[in-house]
């Protein structure tokens, strides 16, 4: 792989590959992997051998509980003690080994195994297995997986004969004997046969696996054995550069020694150097047997056997020939022409060491400077070789007596002539002449001038041999010069175009990482992915190449590329050639690096993925729920559910993975066209893991934590609960009981949420509570205290014995004079149905609706529903998970918070409305106080008969006139009204007369009576002056219901006359009564009037402010009598008891109807005039 000299060295989690390799090395061995962090320890992986032993496929075994070691394989002969021992081992995360009897599922289809419907029945076969349990730890030293290894030892045990096996298998004695012999032979080569039952217990110890070699589940860099060197380590890199230098030394010295016939035996220094070089090259051969190399797929091969075979098949012979000690052989032979010259010529074989340079050329090509140096050295090396050949030709011609060769001319120029020595044995011998150094330099000078096409001519070819060699050298030099100096860039680009592209890609990636300051860990992952992708594709664009081919040829190539998927999965066996070609055209091949996330949680599942190589893990809630390997399929069942699903887990690559995936739309398109194949595909394709399905489980750590908390709560002392604590008071305010009656919503929106305010001592207020909680004694006290804190008023009288609190209803408070029984009122047609009695009478709370039995029934049904919901378990192996609905207190708290939010919003709206009205009143007051407004007491009448609240007050101050308004009041409910402050504004000497008749039953207030019956301590304020305003009894409300919206203004009839106010008398029901004011009260009025302001403007402003309070709280049904007459207000229901009669006044009220409509007409006399806002 160009540029990929290191190979794929990124940390990988090779746990699964190591376990599979170890299991395959042992006969009849299978294993399971279970998650140790999830309750019941679900199975996350099983190999093919286990599927054969158990009779189940991988999809059936995955996610099953391993707490009882494949409980689906238990039978009647399975030892209970062994099961308990296994469970104890898993719970305590220990390592153990024992024998266990399990049952294999067999699909027998014979005459005895067929049911009445003709279907094959599933039978089970007992078999003995040796089980080893080993905990697997991760990089944090936590046990994350359990490895369960099984080995079939049935042949070493006594035959198991049960009634089921005898009846089902129906084997004869001969068949059983043949079966036992066959199974025994399978183990004879590996395990001894144990017939003694006492020795069977030692079988587990004999077949135990060493815990030291147990791999860990973590990412690790590729490990090598201790005696194996990594080809990219620092020592090997330095060693390769030393070998490169020695190779150049060999390439220089070998031609020199051969040409100049230099005997190293005569030069001891050269002999020592050459011997050291030979030893170093021999050591290099040994190191090559223990050095890793990069495989075809880019992986680092560290297996010693594979390394040795690879080296023996490649460079071993050449390296061995180049390391032979030829100088040693030549040193012991003195014969120049014999075998010694042959050994001297064999020194040229050492030039084969240049193959080491070619072998590692890809490493040197990564550096530009090294490449230039290598090219220059190669050019000089060729010139050196040619110089040696040029000297050999000149020496040969000189020895032959040719005296005009270049060597004789050099001797003459240097004045070192040659001379001959004659001997009888060898003939004439050429001696003396130029020095060896001068001859070599001259030869090298000539070759360099020829190769560079310079040719100075001082050294030239003279003989025929020299000329022929010069011609050849010129040709070689021209090619070499053009190649090295003229077209270096072009040749390198043509020869290493893929390498240049690869380096360009790597440089771009490096610059990108440096520019954006990508972290080092992520940068290394990106670089490893780029290198691995290059190793798989070699820089080729697959789509671009396929586009060169026609459609038919492209389909054939795609089928060939996806042949592993089509051949391994049974779902494609029945597919036709056309169907396979259509599917292959849509398959996409992808390569993933370790740590890559293929799917994220919540991501749409739009592909069906087939794993060709590598392994992946499925992570849900930070726990490994499945480990997928070669041949597994994951995704979603598009052909069964057309909706696009979301991934419930993350899928992360553990190693370098090759995946073949097909898009959902493309797959459905092919299945829709090939309908016959679609049925077979849906039936035979089984997903190893469906990403849409979410597993519900509980972690072991969570269960332990819950147990510890439970124990801690038991040991902690109980803290005393103080009912008067401030926090407990606040929480008691937000408590609500479940909603029982739906009519409370109607009461909230009704018109009975306003208070009716009357003068003359009669006070009545209506409040509606849509959700009234059921209060205990302590809670009731807190509730009253909370009401006072909010600014409201609470009836301080002790509750009677008959008082009750009704859920979702309205409590009606009625005051009685004397010992009268309580009356339950269900509806009222007009506001102000409740009346107050004397000082000694207490308010009685009467229950409207009693639903105790119904509340108990609803509470019992709610408890049953909660119990059934707790008993509901999810569809998973975890039987401890329960779905808990929100509690009653939580629902009540949420409802209370929402109600408070609505109340706050309504209060803000009311405040805005009141601020707007005050601004309008101030503007009107400024106009009235302007010059010309006067201080008259009469107000102009409205031509339409309808008046504003301000006009009503003015109308009440005049004399004469009467009104007959007709109003209709919807039914309302009344609650206990708090005591209000009564403010009286009066003018002495005013009197009026009138009479009134009220249609319907109701309550009326007389114009005069005893003071202090309702509130003896109330301050009576009188105002004296000649402003024309009659005495007016008003009541200012101190607090209103929070949930009562402000009603619109009501139409009041114009009245005329002068009114005189007195303290309130006795309140009745259905009758109009009056009483003269006492002298003490009149004196008190007079004394108070002397202290009151006499400014008409101030009185008018005060009245307008009070009017706004009345308008916000009044009911739609109102009636008013004539000035100075008795006023009556109708009530929608007639009391069942006769109304009491009070003395002290005159007047009459005749009820003529029981409807909600009242038409009062006045006739009679009274001591004061009154403006009634009802």
UniProtKB/Swiss-Prot annotation:
Binding annotation for a nucleoside 3',5'-cyclic phosphate: 571-688
Annotated Gene Ontology cellular component terms: plasma membrane; voltage-gated potassium channel complex
Basic residues: compositionally biased ranges: 1034-1043
Extracellular side: 247-268, 336-342, 394-441, 468-470
Comp. bias intervals (Gly residues): 1121-1131
Note: The segment S4 is probably the voltage-sensor and is characterized by a series of positively charged amino acids at every third position. The segment H5 is thought to line the channel pore.
Taxonomic source organism: Drosophila melanogaster (Fruit fly)
Region listing for Disordered, in residue ranges: 742-763, 778-842, 865-884, 930-977, 1022-1097, 1115-1174
Protein name: Potassium voltage-gated channel protein eag
Gene3D superfamilies assigned to the protein according to its UniProt record, in alphabetical order: 1.10.1200.260, 1.10.287.70, Jelly Rolls (2.60.120.10), PAS domain (3.30.450.20)
Intramembrane segments: 442-467
Outcome of swapping residue 787 to A: Reduced eag channel amplitude and accelerated inactivation. Does not affect binding with CASK
